[in-house]
Amino acid sequence: PFGMINAFLLINSQGCILIDTGLPNSEKKIETVLKKLNLTFTDIKLIIITHAHIDHAGNAAKIKFLSGAQVIAHNGDLPYYTGEKKMHFCSTGWFGRVFSKVGVIQKPYDKFEPDILLTSKDRFDLKRYGIDGEVMSTPGHTQGSISVVIDNDKAIVGDLISSGILLGGIVRTHKAKRPPFEENPLQVSQELQSIANKGVKTFFMGHGGPLPQKEVLRHIEKLKHLVTD
């Protein structure tokens, strides 16, 4: 809604990789973008889910069915994907506290079983899909959060970081902030630092952005102070 939720396509001659699937029933929006690029759902060769929140994983089962693509996710969030556990939310401020009571985010979505499960500090090379990049475990927002590093200078980090007001993506999109929910800010700071240490210059996220490395480093320092204060 209002451009606050981002999903990403990595495209080459072999097809494309979809990173996150949006809310349930948003497949028409994805189809519209695919058509503009002269692509169809069957051109999607892999679906990467950065974490289990409904605005990222809510349409995964439908897109998996429409595309026939494999889904990669992390074992840390598996009970939420399969519906074994109800999602819990650790609010970072007033908006998170209010938003967590809204029906949409609490609504269960269609269950699915990821085809490829990362565990611990696993990495998944995307070369087999013609992409110079890797999927890596980056816990903190949720225990099962993952990120994608591309060409060693770009990263798609889900909700490890956000920008803009409310959910993100509206006004002040150049300023980093904590997302409405975050389980472990210390882990988030460590994972963002690890990604920056790889030489990543541009960070793309689920809400707002993109952000340059300099702004992400500033946010990391704020998180460190938050933890120690």
How would you name each of these model-derived features?
Residues 1-37, 148-163:
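Conserved beta-strand hairpin/beta-sheet module of binuclear metal-dependent hydrolase folds
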Residues 24-25, 116, 123, 132-139, ...:
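Metallo-beta-lactamase
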Residues 211-229:
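Binuclear metal-ion centers of metallo-dependent hydrolases, dominated by the metallo-beta-lactamase
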Residues 17-19, 48, 71, 154-156, ...:
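Residue-level marker for buried hydrophobic side chains located in beta-strands
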